[in-house]
């Protein structure tokens, strides 16, 4: 990815992201910040919320999901597979949070999304999480730095602020 390439070339001092393939992480340090769960979200007045929510019922509605090959997509497919479900044909595949949010807020779409991407929308009541539990503790999100290069004072100050802002 561009983040890993930028770190390895020295163009970037640090990055924050998901844990990658261990082969791609050679030469980099990884410090876990938090685990991010997968959420299934809808608009607050979505018809799904009027009855018992099951994954098979969710799959009767239009779905927005990350493209194949992404970690959120893999997590969505694992969740569905555990319940004997598959993504409906014709689901929207996009990395655009703004498009996904718009489809979910304005229409009856169900969005499979990492929790951090919709934290504020959930808190403000713009979106509602369906009562569906995703498998595992969540995706590891952390700080990436180069093994062979000390961080500048500014980068160290930034990392200190990031660490202090993380919940225990």
Residue ranges and their predicted role:
Residues 128-168:
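A late-sequence structural motif
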Residues 1-38, 42, 128-130:
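Short beta-strand-centered segments that line the small-molecule binding cleft or hinge
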Residues 48-49, 55, 62-83, 151-155, ...:
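Secondary-structure junction motif
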Residues 6-8, 58, 102-108, 143:
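Hydrophobic residues within well-ordered alpha-helices
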Residues 16-25, 78, 82, 97-127:
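A ligand-binding cleft/hinge motif common to bilobed small-molecule-binding domains
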Residues 27-64, 68, 146, 153:
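Flexible hinge/capping segments at coil-to-helix
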Residues 1-5, 92-101:
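Short helix-initiation/N-cap motifs at beta->coil->alpha
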Residues 65, 86-96:
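Short beta-strand-to-loop elements that line the ligand-binding cleft
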């Amino acid at each position: 990815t561009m983040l890993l390439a930028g770190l390895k070339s020295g163009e970037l001092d640090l990055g924050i992201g998901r844990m990658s393939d261990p082969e791609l992480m050679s030469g980099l340090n990884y410090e876990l910040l938090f685990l991010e769960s997968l959420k299934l979200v809808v608009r607050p007045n979505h018809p799904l919320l009027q009855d018992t929510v099951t994954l098979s019922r969710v799959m009767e509605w239009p779905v927005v999901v990350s493209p194949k090959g992404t970690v959120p997509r893999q997590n969505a497919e694992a969740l569905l597979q555990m319940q004997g479900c598959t993504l409906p044909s014709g689901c929207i595949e996009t990395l655009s949070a703004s498009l996904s949010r718009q489809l979910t807020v304005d229409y009856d779409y169900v969005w499979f999304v990492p929790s951090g991407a919709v934290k504020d929308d959930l808190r403000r009541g713009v979106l509602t999480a369906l009562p569906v539990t995703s498998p595992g503790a969540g995706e590891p999100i952390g700080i990436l730095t180069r093994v062979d290069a000390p961080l500048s004072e500014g980068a160290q100050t930034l990392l200190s602020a990031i660490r202090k802002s993380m919940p225990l």
